[in-house]
């Protein structure tokens, strides 16, 4: 592919297109990948469709002001995002250790973007072009639009609008608001006059002219009072709906952060249009010499069938970004994309995914949402299925069947995550059977996350009984279709509410599973999630009940070690945890013991595991022993895929 297949990145590109001045310049923390899995590509192509000229400055050197000047000053302004992931999550692990790789950068190497990329980029743009409007968006800006707890600073930070000095913030999925804002700018409106576009947040000196709004506790209150923080979050959480959501206001000293209600979800026709835009569907050629951009490998032959999720897991901030209402593409749109993939030169016959945040949520949760919006005080599938929930996999199944019939398609996988409780609510087993028969390759990854019901309740996840029923049914179906396939559970340690007792309960369950999972993630307090609010305040903001928070680093290490108790290097921590919890009954050589009395030699320990001694593995281990190696993912990937 040539540079002309991409949006312009240099003055040379502008000359070839006879462009003197760009309308907009997108500055992003990711490398430039022109694929609909990347927000920069979507916003760039949407604006191009509307008749605007758009350039890309990808991963500029933040220590060199000239990098921000290389495309000149745009006519209407700069659009700034950190990339597909919050820059701090991208750079640091849950234990705040620096990551050494970056799937969104050339060659997978780190160091191409600064911490708090949105703030840094905005400050540099202001330095280069003092009066140029700046609009921020993407996940980093979206989830930091109000005063928020910042795990890396261990303090409450102001709205990112204050820290970045940006003129406007677009939150959530930005196609509709960016078109409306850009057209207003084209018609001559000044950026500081744009205050009525849904899906935007701005700063106001006074709020006398506002109507029908809710003022939440101020930055000064939430940064000094945890009850006020919890109260502010609760209001934000309940008002993220395009039909019933109110304008929200939060005072920051003498100014006000104002969030307009969310944009209505995209219609099916609008979704189809977005995904039919002329993407190059790969990374820019300038990265070829550095080994390309690793992130494209996972998505190049994957299809986004829908957006949104009504699962409402507490540790996921999707409600604040994509929303609870499902927005799906038509089958024709998806089939066209699948057919197009088969003509790509490096297509090997495998479509890696057809899904979204949760693969089997292909339609709205209920008919009520269409007229009244999402319910304010209850969830669709938690703690149990709502009576109005539409449980039906027929349309999704028919789509998968059609894709399977496309010439040159050998296999269609589902990797974006199956919500197992929703699957169990379906009385028709047809989808479950075909899922096992056609859409997994030896193993299915699911996310029970924990096994203690008190922790699951705080996570917003179904009870242990639901997962146990799913596991039994999964293996029963595989037995009937004569397939020897396994489950790989995602598990989380140190979530709010998880004490040593709960971690030991999970360790005992893992022992019965028969192998040590590598898919273990420490809870990561990222901006915008309900669980992060619990972590910071020690309060469940929805119930106002106190929550136990494992913040001590030693205890967090113990909890993680318990989930991988059979790993030799974890022996001392596991033993210390069991003694601290007064569970010495789990130390010894009995069938229920997690570890022996004495720490074995490392080689002997491995040999014991393989021989099934000490009961660290059950009879399934020989079949299952290679699962962890084949599925090793970095913790960023695990964080994104949880359902």
Curated annotation (Swiss-Prot):
Residues forming the Radical SAM core domain are 295-566
TM annotation in the entry: none
Family affiliation:
Belongs to the UPF0313 family.
Question: How and how many cofactors are bound, per the record note?
Answer: Binds 1 [4Fe-4S] cluster. The cluster is coordinated with 3 cysteines and an exchangeable S-adenosyl-L-methionine.
Q: Which cofactor does it need?
A: [4Fe-4S] cluster
- Where does the chain bind [4Fe-4S] cluster? 309, 313, 316
Keyword tags: 4Fe-4S, Iron, Iron-sulfur, Metal-binding, S-adenosyl-L-methionine
Biased composition (Low complexity) is annotated at 610-621
Keyword S-adenosyl-L-methionine in record: yes
Matching Pfam families, A to Z?
DUF3362, Radical_SAM, Radical_SAM_N
**Segment Disordered: which positions?**
598-643
Could you tell me where the Basic residues compositional bias lies? 600-609, 630-643
In terms of InterPro entries, this protein maps to: Elp3/MiaA/NifB-like_rSAM, rSAM, rSAM_horseshoe, UPF0313, UPF0313_C, UPF0313_N
Which protein is depicted? UPF0313 protein CLD_0573
Under the GO molecular function aspect, what terms does this record hold? 4 iron, 4 sulfur cluster binding; catalytic activity; iron ion binding
